[in-house]
């Protein structure tokens, strides 16, 4: 059976050996050039291919059409991937009639993504395994063909677990490859509700934060022990690496990071104590703990830092452009609730953020992003995370001012995206549920749903396509230039401070604010085209909590992801929204200050929005990516959101001239 193989590392070598032993004909092998900065303790796929007289290639981009065509010319019947580090495109999968199969180092659906070997140790797991699964567009999500469990012993470190996994993989392939060859396999779909996903790890992820329990720090040491880069800490500005450790249930009142003793070298933790058995100062040699203490000048009572003293207290700097807006001001409140964020904000007004202006970790400048380009570039360079939230996002403006929508929403934001590329800063970009347009799927899915908009002579779509093109530009920068990004798509977030009643008076607001204005002024609630259009309304608190988790980015799980943030359970038509709002209004303690309800009035969209408008019948999100990447799901019922939003706006109204 002819096959093309994508392989790297020890797993790649043993996968190739297993294929040859099972009688497969390998037409070509695709691998990687070795990274000179990486300690190469593993076997070389390139050397093995050369020894076995098999053509071997290491292209920068195997998904390029030229390489796809070359692979097609090889006419593979089946494709295998063994620890190949790049995603392989659908076009390549489809070249093999029997499909493509990948070997993954975990018990899928747990620990999808990168570095599962290290992550299971970091998280203190007692079991892992290897999985052979069918390859699909989403990484590690295809049906399972075979699995083998591997126990993780308390004394296992990364290299010993690696050897166990290699042994298990060899067994699994010996058992399974003949069945694939004869088309005799049973595939089991993965349970998406059990899936977890982890991102790549870098050496900087292995800081030892002494306020954590000793068991957690010991697991970190195990996960990145030699030949991985090692867990590390600092004495002042002197970095040292911990190669092996032991947990001591030492009851001590010492501050975390304090040296309890130097022989053995025992460090107080948030819970218990960690003995540093072996370690290394700087780029020196490995030595046992008490000698390391002497080398570092440690005595009982010395304090260790998780990072150099000069940066130990630096907060993550978050730049929010459009900080006075609905999302911006609520996000600022959530970030400042923690003690490890510094927020820098720009906007043309400050009414919604006045409560933060005296906060020591909030820095605000009043200005326009189209004018203050130098300030913005400087702060993109200065900050760690950038959220460009400035946009015209009210439907009436799409038909009333389409060019202004394009200039602000697309052109100004493109400049900010390019700053992030230039200075290698992480960008969290607010796309929109509008990008799905007139998609007919029951649930709008980030990875599979088609994005469908109307004809060019319907300017209503200029917002949608401006956002969609920016999404595609960001994605391309991520693929080609390594931009660290996450795209999030809010689905009808609502709550206090959504627009304002003055904006609603000129029609430039979202639906609920417009409806509240109608109730406050005693004017009819206008139902555009009957108000039958359905939306899924999401409480701002749920939305902001998801966005906060994106900023936190635990395990880099959000990198390169597109994430819907919405509440599919809170689906209602605009008419139903109006009825729920009216019922809440009639029960409100301030109701007697306002005019009688003037009823509902059906109006045509062309009369309300003007020429060139089209509406969407439904818009319901799939939130699988939010579950997978954020461990998030919305919790707040729509009625509670309506009640709180209405209460907020009614209490902003000057009641002196209202009837009583």
UniProtKB/Swiss-Prot annotation:
Domain of life: Bacteria
GO biological process: lipid A biosynthetic process; lipopolysaccharide biosynthetic process; response to antibiotic
Key words of the record: Antibiotic resistance, Lipid A biosynthesis, Lipid biosynthesis, Lipid metabolism, Lipopolysaccharide biosynthesis, Multifunctional enzyme, NAD, Oxidoreductase, Transferase
Amino-acid positions noted as binding NAD(+) in the UniProt annotation, renumbered to this chain: 347, 368-369
Reaction catalyzed: UDP-alpha-D-glucuronate + NAD(+) = UDP-beta-L-threo-pentopyranos-4-ulose + CO2 + NADH; UDP-4-amino-4-deoxy-beta-L-arabinose + (6R)-10-formyltetrahydrofolate = UDP-4-deoxy-4-formamido-beta-L-arabinose + (6S)-5,6,7,8-tetrahydrofolate + H(+)
Record-listed E.C. numbers: 2.1.2.13, 1.1.1.305
GO cellular component labels: membrane
Record site: Raises pKa of active site His: 140
Matches recorded under NCBIfam families: PRK06988.1, PRK08125.1, PRK11908.1
Family recorded in the similarity comment: In the N-terminal section; belongs to the Fmt family. UDP-L-Ara4N formyltransferase subfamily. In the C-terminal section; belongs to the NAD(P)-dependent epimerase/dehydratase family. UDP-glucuronic acid decarboxylase subfamily.
Name under which the protein is recorded: Bifunctional polymyxin resistance protein ArnA
Organism: Shigella flexneri
């Amino acid at each position: 059976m002819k096959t093309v193989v994508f392989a790297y590392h020890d797993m790649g070598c043993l996968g190739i050996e297993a294929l040859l032993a099972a009688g497969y004909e390998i037409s070509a092998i695709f691998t990687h050039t070795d990274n000179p900065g990486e300690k190469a303790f593993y076997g070389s796929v390139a050397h093995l291919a050369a020894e076995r007289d098999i053509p071997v290639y290491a292209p920068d981009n195997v998904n390029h059409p030229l390489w796809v065509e070359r692979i097609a010319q090889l006419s593979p019947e089946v494709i295998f991937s063994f620890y190949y580090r790049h995603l392989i495109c659908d076009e390549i999968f489809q070249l093999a009639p029997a499909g493509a199969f990948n070997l993954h180092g975990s018990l899928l659906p747990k620990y999808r993504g990168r570095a599962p070997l290290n992550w299971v140790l970091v998280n203190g797991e007692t079991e892992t395994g290897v999985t052979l699964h069918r390859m699909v567009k989403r990484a590690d999500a295809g049906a399972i063909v075979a699995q083998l469990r591997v126990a993780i012993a308390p004394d296992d470190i990364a290299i010993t677990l690696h050897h166990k996994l290699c042994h298990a993989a060899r067994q699994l392939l010996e058992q399974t490859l003949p069945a694939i060859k004869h088309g005799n396999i049973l595939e089991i779909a993965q349970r998406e509700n059990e899936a977890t996903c982890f991102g790549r790890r870098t050496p900087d992820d292995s800081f030892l934060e002494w306020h954590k329990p000793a068991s957690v720090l010991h697991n970190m040491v195990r996960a990145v022990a030699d030949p991985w880069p090692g867990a590390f800490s600092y004495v002042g500005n002197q970095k040292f690496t911990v190669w092996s450790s032991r947990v001591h249930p030492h009851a001590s009142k010492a501050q975390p990071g304090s040296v309890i003793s130097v022989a053995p070298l025992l460090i107080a933790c948030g819970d218990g104590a960690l003995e540093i058995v072996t370690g290394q100062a700087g780029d020196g040699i490995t030595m046992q703990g008490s000698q390391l203490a002497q080398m570092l000048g440690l005595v009982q009572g010395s304090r260790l830092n998780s990072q150099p003293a000069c940066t130990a207290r630096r907060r993550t700097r978050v730049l929010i452009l459009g900080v006075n807006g609905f999302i911006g001001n609520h996000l600022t409140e959530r970030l400042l609730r923690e003690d490890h964020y510094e927020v820098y904000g720009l906007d043309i007004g400050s009414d919604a953020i006045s409560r933060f202006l005296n906060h020591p970790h909030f820095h605000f400048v009043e200005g326009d992003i189209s004018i203050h380009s130098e300030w913005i570039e400087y702060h993109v360079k200065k900050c760690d995370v950038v959220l460009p939230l400035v946009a015209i996002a009210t439907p009436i403006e799409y038909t009333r001012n389409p060019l202004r929508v394009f200039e602000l929403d697309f052109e100004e934001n493109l400049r900010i995206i390019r700053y992030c590329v230039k200075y290698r800063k992480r960008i969290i970009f607010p796309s929109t549920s509008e990008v799905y347009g007139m998609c007919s799927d029951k649930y709008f899915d980030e990875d599979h749903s088609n994005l469908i908009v109307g004809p060019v002579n319907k300017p209503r779509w200029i917002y949608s396509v401006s956002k969609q093109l920016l999404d595609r530009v960001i994605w391309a920068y991520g693929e080609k230039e390594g931009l660290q990004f996450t795209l999030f798509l809010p689905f009808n977030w609502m709550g206090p401070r959504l627009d304002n009643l003055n904006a609603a008076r000129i029609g430039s607001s979202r639906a609920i604010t417009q409806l509240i204005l109608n109730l406050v002024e005693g004017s009819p609630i206008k139902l555009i085209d009957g108000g039958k259009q359905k939306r899924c309304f999401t409480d701002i608190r749920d939305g902001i909590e998801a966005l906060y988790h994106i900023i936190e980015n635990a395990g880099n799980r959000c990198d390169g992801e597109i994430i819907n943030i919405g509440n599919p359970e809170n689906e209602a038509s605009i008419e139903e929204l109006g009825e729920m709002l009216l019922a809440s209004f009639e029960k409100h303690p301030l109701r007697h200050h306002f005019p009688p309800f003037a009823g509902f009035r059906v109006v045509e969209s062309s009369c309300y929005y003007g020429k060139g408008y089209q509406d969407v019948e439904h818009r319901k999100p799939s939130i699988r990516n939010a579950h997978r990447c954020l461990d998030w799901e919305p919790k707040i019922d729509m009625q509670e959101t309506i009640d709180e939003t209405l209460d907020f706006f009614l209490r902003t109204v000057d009641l002196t001239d209202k009837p009583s």
